[in-house]
Curated annotation (Swiss-Prot):
Residues 2-40, 41-83, 88-128, 129-171 form the Beta/gamma crystallin 'Greek key' domain. The gene is Crygd. Residues 84-87 are annotated as: Connecting peptide. This is Gamma-crystallin D. Has a two-domain beta-structure, folded into four very similar Greek key motifs. There are six different gamma crystallins identified in mouse lens. Gene3D superfamilies: Crystallins. It comes from Mus musculus (Mouse). Belongs to the beta/gamma-crystallin family. Keywords: Eye lens protein, Repeat. Crystallins are the dominant structural components of the vertebrate eye lens. One of its GO terms (cellular component) is cytoplasm.
Length: 174
């Protein structure tokens, strides 16, 4: 079970809303989000309703302003609690439809360029666990939640290009 609290103002001030499940539309509860407190679980925040727009991965902790979660604005319109899995395994491919060179990961990777010798991934398969993919190295830049399943081309995980810099397992330690 997860718990997250959204605050309209920075520093955990102003009107707030507490949440423990996925929400496809948070607009009725607050007009802007400038700080967040994650009491438990791992969460993905979305700038738009229905789990669309820029994504932001948050784990337990305090985020006193939206820049702390690498947000571009104070817009949070939907959220998803990410289920925790015991093991993690993902396969990345250099071409669409699982073609070309493949590499499998079971651990976090801060620099795909260093491990894979290129930084464009056109398809992938999440075999176990949930992952967050970043378009820059060292877990920076645009973020994409990857749940178990097949992603035949980068559009399938919501990216506008094939650039991948790093990836991280979704893990929450209680």
């Amino acid at each position: 079970m997860g718990k997250i609290t959204f605050y309209e103002d920075r520093g955990f001030q102003g009107r707030h809303y507490e949440c423990s499940t996925d929400h496809s539309n948070l607009q009725p509860y607050f007009s802007r989000c400038n700080s967040v407190r994650v009491d438990s679980g791992c969460w993905m925040l979305y700038e738009q309703p229905n789990f669309t727009g820029c994504q932001y991965f948050l784990r337990r902790g305090d985020y006193p302003d939206y820049q702390q979660w690498m947000g571009f604005s104070d817009s949070v319109r939907s959220c998803r609690l990410i289920p925790h899995a015991g093991s993690h395994r993902i396969r990345l491919y250099e071409r669409e439809e699982y073609r070309g060179q493949m590499i499998e990961f079971t651990e976090d990777c801060p620099s795909l360029q260093d491990r894979f010798h290129f930084n464009e991934i056109y398809s992938l398969n999440v075999l176990e666990g949930c992952w967050v993919l970043y378009d820059m190295t060292n877990y920076r830049g645009r973020q994409y939640l990857l749940r178990p399943g097949e992603y035949r081309r980068y559009h399938d995980w919501g990216a506008m290009n094939a650039r991948v810099g790093s990836l991280r397992r979704v893990m929450d330690f209680y």
